Amino acid sequence: MFLEIDRLMNTFVPAPGGAFLQTIIGSQFPGKPKFLPEKIPHTIDLDVDAKSIAFEIQAVDKDKPTILLAHGMGGCSESGYIKRIAAKLGLQGYGVLLINQRGSGSGMGLSSSLWNGGSSEDLAKMIDYFLMRHPHLLLIGFSLSGNILLKYLGEGRSIPPGLIGALSVNPPVDLRVASHIISTHRSSWLFNRYYMRLIGN
């Protein structure tokens, strides 16, 4: 499992200007994926009144695990960073699953509520859904979905044997502290406006 993750990851070098500037640049200048394969849609029942739409890029190398990508707050399966990573993984032969959290992306309007930092049951249902279709999954959660992924793994549930690895990218492990930093940083007005616009859309 760890060797597999090591092969996927390069040494991280932060952008000049720190994390805030990197977040802004990544969202405002998304670039174009080099590889845009056909995506197969999946409709997943999360609750009686909630559905999620996820998309699958089929594997070229059937011996490799399928990788599930979970977006951060205000994002969706169409977010630039999700598509860039999916494109790179697809070029390496991996099957890729691009999920949308409850009320996000293509699932907007299909739920009576929105996802939050405690939505581990939604993630569990998506994992179970895809494990019925793929024998081995590797999970990658970004930002708030990274926090949900850690919550899913640490709740004492029985972890399915087909789940062979998990990677949490920049998770706000302490949501209260993360909220305080975003709210009090000198650039907080910019982040609040940016996220409120994303959530409102």
What are these regions (language model features)?
Residues 19-62:
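N-terminal cap/lid segment of alpha/beta-hydrolase-fold proteins
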Residues 64-72:
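Short beta-strand element of the alpha/beta-hydrolase
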Residues 73, 100-104, 172:
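Short beta-to-alpha linker loops that shape the active-site pocket of alpha/beta-hydrolase fold enzymes
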Residues 73-80, 90, 105:
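Short substrate-entry loop that stabilizes the transition state in hydrolases
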Residues 81-98:
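Short amphipathic alpha-helix adjacent to the substrate-entry channel of hydrolases
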Residues 83, 87, 124, 128, ...:
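Short, hydrophobic alpha-helix immediately C-terminal to the catalytic nucleophile
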Residues 88, 102-138:
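Catalytic nucleophile-loop/oxyanion-hole region of alpha/beta-hydrolase
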Residues 138-201:
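Alpha/beta-hydrolase-fold enzymes
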